[in-house]
């Protein structure tokens, strides 16, 4: 074993959906790239899509997961400008929340951006047609590390 860990890059997150074609249309409308749409045996089908600028993709389909449709909550999408991201997604048909921040870690949501404007503090949210939920997190400057 060396002192340097191997690269472990998150590639795919699986989303449980009830209607594959509806989900594909929804994510396409948001500008996500269709990487694959493969049928398999016995009704299996997997769709892979990737958000603009992301190295990580999503999978959904038929017989892809046993999780209940809509059961995935708070997947993070990092953006550099929360208001620009909100406008873009809303213009593409997503029902995006107003910007909000948290009173404290684990605390309740508070309307409006994080008062100091610091990175990692301002959010907005939206859900897909099944209720899988996404958080937009504004990061202007990444913390070191």
Name every feature range the model reports, one short phrase each.
Residues 62-85:
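Helix-adjacent hinge/juxtasegments
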Residues 1-6, 12, 37-38, 45-47, ...:
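Vicinal oxygen chelate
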Residues 19, 81, 128:
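Acidic di-acidic motifs
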Residues 1-3, 61-64:
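Short beta-strand/turn micro-motifs at beta-sheet edges
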Residues 5-8, 14-56, 84, 91:
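Core segments of cupin and vicinal oxygen chelate
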